[in-house]
Amino acid sequence: SWNPPFCGDLDIRIARNGTWFYLGTPIGRFELVKLFSSILKVEDGKYFLVTPVEKVGIQVDDAPFIAVDFNEMEINGEKALKFETHVGDQVIANVENPIRVERDAVSDEPAPYIHIRNGLDALIDRKTFYRLVEIGQHKKHENENWFGIESASSFFPIIKSEDLDNSI
């Protein structure tokens, strides 16, 4: 694991929609964004691009990645959901890569995420979240009824069943 010296902040920002900006201008080259995403690290809630010789800070508005799709598959006879990010990372939702849903404090809108690697998350885009909800199910979780998603022998609660029933 590289531990190069911190060399200051770069004017690079990852917007909530996954767009990377340099000096306020979108980075249009996918290959460059993919390269940068491969050296992205998070430490104590701060984001860095890390190479063997330097470490620079960048700004991330929400999550650094966007989960743009998932596929249902079987692993050892069990259903699993394989997610893909906008930069091509693929992960299976499981104990190591859990799905979680946070609620916006003002609007109460759900903000769904999946862990990608080393503390880095992807915001699950709206169309993908709607597809997830279509395959969701009600299940007992920590002694309460929840609506959630099952993948790789793990259950990921989205909303309490009673809250879902009250919101319809």
Residues of each region from the PLM?
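Long, non-globular segments of proteins
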Residues: 1-168
